[in-house]
From Swiss-Prot:
Catalytic class of the enzyme: transferase
EC number: 2.8.1.13
The species this protein was found in: Mycoplasma capricolum subsp. capricolum (strain California kid / ATCC 27343 / NCTC 10154)
Highest taxon of the lineage: Bacteria
Gene for this chain: mnmA
Region described as Interaction with target base in tRNA: spans on this chain: 104-106
Catalytic reaction list: S-sulfanyl-L-cysteinyl-[protein] + uridine(34) in tRNA + AH2 + ATP = 2-thiouridine(34) in tRNA + L-cysteinyl-[protein] + A + AMP + diphosphate + H(+)
Residues that bind ATP: G8, L9, S10, G11, G12, V13, D14, S15, M34, G134
Protein purpose: Catalyzes the 2-thiolation of uridine at the wobble position (U34) of tRNA, leading to the formation of s(2)U34.
InterPro entries: MnmA-like, MnmA-like_C, MnmA-like_central, MnmA-like_central_sf, Rossmann-like_a/b/a_fold
Protein name: tRNA-specific 2-thiouridylase MnmA
Assigned GO CC terms: cytoplasm
Active site residues per record: C109 (nucleophile), C208 (cysteine persulfide intermediate)
């Protein structure tokens, strides 16, 4: 009897090709399209360029997913997780921005929606043995450690293990990643060869399941903005006014709107209580560098005691944003939920609220939220 795989069929090229490959491998395949955002229900008006369109991008995605399912002769189911997305992902996203932190909704979306709500629905309602996604990542079972390992994809430029760092053993044991050993070019080539409607569709960008938005306007739907001073961190001189401290991220250069300056300025720090945005000039970029950070809400994907000699302090690599090169670090345990991450060399623009993701070579160990940056 064939094993059944339910694929998160999003209407994009990656999940389309994932379906095709699983069929080629002999699985029984069905698609499941998720709708996780409703602009009307969620007051998504400001910054939404699609608000007056006859057909919203999500509905077009569903039509594309349906066309792919029809072409491959598989069933396509549809499910709404609009409330769950709001409760588990978007509420946290907004609360973090209120604190002038910079969260990563894609990581939460994977943890709570794609690999939790979706996974449970596929197994309990559709009788799936596995789920599959169009992510670029690998899962392998290590017979020595008896752990499911999340491993970087063959195409390092597309590797998405950073966004999967909050997953657990149970989720990995039920997940297939058919694109693990393919490049994006190979995926598009397969889609073209199979005449899939999504072959030349551009990759989705913007906020997970919400899409492209004018970000400043979008946040104004949910958080009142308050102007304040822009201050040179070196001289303490007021240089101008910011439009709301939450709209800026550490290391940002564009959009600060300081006119008449002899050189570009970068966002260096934020004082939430005083509503001050601190900036530094290009010649004072040392203010952007830090030597370590504190992280919390740690998630170890696997039993790290089987991978490092001392779980209280060990060397590994880390990424502090997507597509960043791996950095050598020492991870020191403070308590079960708090760790200090010490950098082998100072790193630029480490941002509170973002995710620190830890690796041993190509194996993703897990991730944690950056809570404090130490200069």
């Amino acid at each position: 009897m064939k094993q059944k795989v339910v694929v998160g069929l999003s209407g994009g090229v990656d999940s389309s090709v994932a379906c095709y490959l699983l069929l080629q491998q002999g699985y029984e395949v069905e698609g499941l399209f998720m709708r996780n955002w409703d602009s009307a229900t969620n007051n998504d008006i400001l910054g939404n360029t699609n608000i007056n369109d006859d057909i919203c991008p999500q509905e077009q995605d569903y039509l594309d997913a349906k066309a792919v399912a029809d072409k491959l002769n598989i069933k396509l189911h549809r499910v709404d997780f609009i409330k769950e997305y709001w409760d588990y992902v978007f509420s946290y996203f907004i609360e973090e921005y209120k604190k002038a932190r910079t969260p990563n909704p894609d990581i939460l979306c994977n943890k709570y929606i794609k690999f939790d709500k979706f996974l449970n629905y596929a197994i309990n309602q559709l009788n799936a043995d596995y789920i599959a996604m169009g992510h670029y990542a690998k899962v392998e079972f290590n017979k020595t450690t008896k752990q499911y390992e999340l491993i970087k994809a063959s195409d390092i430029n597309k590797d998405q293990t950073y966004f999967l760092s909050q997953l657990n053993q149970n989720q990995l044991s039920k997940t297939l990643f058919p694109l693990a050993n393919l490049t994006k070019e190979q995926v598009r080539k397969i889609a073209l060869e199979q005449n899939l409607i999504t072959a030349n569709k551009k990759d989705s960008t913007g906020i997970c399941f919400i899409g492209e938005r004018n970000f400043t306007s979008f946040l104004q739907n949910y958080i009142p903005s308050q102007t304040g001073d822009i201050v040179d961190i070196k001289t303490n001189k007021v240089l101008g006014k910011h439009i709301g401290i939450m709209y800026y991220t550490i290391g940002q250069r564009k959009g600060i709107n300081l006119s008449g300056m002899s050189e570009p300025y970068y966002v260096a720090d934020k004082d939430v209580k005083k509503n001050i945005l601190y900036v530094c000039s290009t010649s004072d970029q040392s203010y952007l560098y830090s030597t370590s950070c504190l992280v919390n809400d740690i998630n170890w994907i696997l039993d790290i005691s089987k991978y490092v000699d001392d779980v209280n302090q060990f060397e590994c690599q880390a990424k502090f944003r997507y597509r960043q090169l791996d950095n050598k670090v020492v991870v020191k345990k403070i308590d079960d939920n708090n760790y200090k991450v010490m950098f082998k060399k100072p790193l630029k623009a480490i941002t509170i609220g973002q995710q620190a993701v830890f690796y041993l070579d190509d194996i993703c160990l897990g991730g944690a939220v950056i809570d404090k940056v130490i200069k």
